[in-house]
């Protein structure tokens, strides 16, 4: 338990290696992961090459403006201002849970737990930044108009229609506690 420090041993049983994954589940999770990785990571060398295009080719009209505003020159919290060219934000996805796929229906959303770290390119070292939970709704628009380059990034017309990120307090490292020094 991360809060009390109590340790326990749990034994998993079952055959987890042969778990069947449907093609639809694999494609949905891959698209969700690609969007979150592109949207939440930052590297000055990749933002214009891949992250920007991937995010905007998958972001719907209600989602794209927030990403554009995040990287706007007028935003004092924009990643380039915070990290510059010498540091990058790396994303590690911990889990993806598809939502709304019960009863043979297609999933319409996902919850993604991920951790971010800041990578110092000069030193080659990473430092934990935070843990987050992204909640999204999505659909597929096969008739979505994309140029050939964007269609290669998003061949099935995956479209994120709603997107929200919150702090994941369950997996966040505990803050340091100060104890009074004995006299």
Language-model segments: which ranges?
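Structured, amphipathic secondary-structure segments that form assembly/contact surfaces
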Residues: 1-26, 30, 40, 46-183
């Amino acid at each position: 338990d991360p809060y009390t420090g109590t340790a326990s041993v749990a034994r998993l049983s079952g055959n987890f290696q042969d778990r069947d994954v449907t093609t639809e589940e694999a494609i949905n999770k891959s698209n969700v992961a690609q969007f979150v990785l592109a949207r939440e990571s930052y590297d000055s060398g990749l933002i214009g090459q891949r992250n920007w295009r991937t995010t905007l080719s998958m972001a719907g009209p209600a989602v794209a403006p927030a990403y554009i505003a995040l990287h706007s020159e007028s935003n004092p919290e924009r990643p380039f201002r915070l990290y510059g060219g010498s540091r990058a934000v790396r994303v590690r996805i911990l889990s993806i849970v598809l939502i709304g796929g019960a009863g043979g229906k297609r999933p319409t959303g996902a919850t993604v737990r991920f951790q971010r770290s800041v990578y110092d390119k000069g030193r080659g070292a990473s430092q934990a930044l935070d843990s987050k939970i992204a909640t999204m709704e999505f659909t597929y628009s096969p008739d979505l108009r994309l140029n050939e380059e964007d269609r290669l990034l998003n061949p099935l017309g995956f479209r994120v229609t709603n997107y929200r990120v919150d702090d994941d307090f369950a997996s966040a490292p505990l803050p340091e506690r100060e104890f009074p020094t004995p006299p």
